[in-house]
Amino acid sequence: MTDADEDVEAAGDAAIEEPPEPRPIEPAVPEEFGLVQVWWGDGKGKTTAALGMGFRAAGHGYRVHLLQFMKGGTPSVENVRGEYNAIAAMPGFSYETTGHYGWHRRLDDVEDEHAARAESALERARELVDATRDADRDSPIPSDADPEMGVDMLLLDEVLYATNRGLIDPDDLLALIDAKPGDLELVLTGGHERPEYVTDRADLVSEVRKEVHPIDAGQAARKGTEY
């Protein structure tokens, strides 16, 4: 082996480092939260991106809550969506769903029931925003606190899909955005149509665009990737 080969091997070894031991997660107050994020598009990854941010924030000790508008509703959701089990194991991260049994217009639920569930979820979001506004924002929110004590990051998953489908009024969603406290990070996901009504209120707008998707070739949703 030449000196050059040894240098390359040494450089490769040096580039691989053991991860540090995980530290206990202590509740903390975010210093730079308060933006509105919009994730929309016909590609896969909108919910996944929101969940990733949620886990990242919770890893810093921030209180995160996921409210899903168009998902859930099975007798045992923990056996259906892997993220629910992961959230349950993560301090400072919680979730709830609207109890939809599948996607709007795909199963047998009537239109009125879908709209009622979406409106119920929006009312729940209002409650959480109000609770956060009334909370003591100078002190960390305990990781095991009920979300009604306030949250640092609120993920409204598929809320934009619900507005696209006409299940909730876009003006009601705008009112929710206007009512949020300045230090609450609000993440909105869903929908294949650009939500023009909300983009001028957002600090971040990301379009997730599909180029190729296995569903187009007949591949069903896979456990561990789609749920």
Give residue spans per PLM region.
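Phosphate-binding/switch loop-helix module in NTP-utilizing enzymes
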Residues: 105-182
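Hydrophobic anchor at the start of a short beta-strand
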Residues: 64, 186, 205
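Haloarchaeal acidic low-complexity proteome signature biased toward cell-envelope/secretome components but also
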Residues: 1-33, 137-144, 221, 226
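Conserved nucleotide-binding/hydrolysis micro-motifs of P-loop NTPases
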Residues: 71-74, 101-102, 160-161, 192-195, ...
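Short beta-strands and strand-loop turn motifs
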Residues: 66-68, 154-159, 189
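Conserved P-loop
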Residues: 35-133
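Phosphate-binding/switch region of NTP-binding enzymes
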Residues: 192-227
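Sensor-1/coupling segment of RecA-like P-loop NTPase cores
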Residues: 176-195
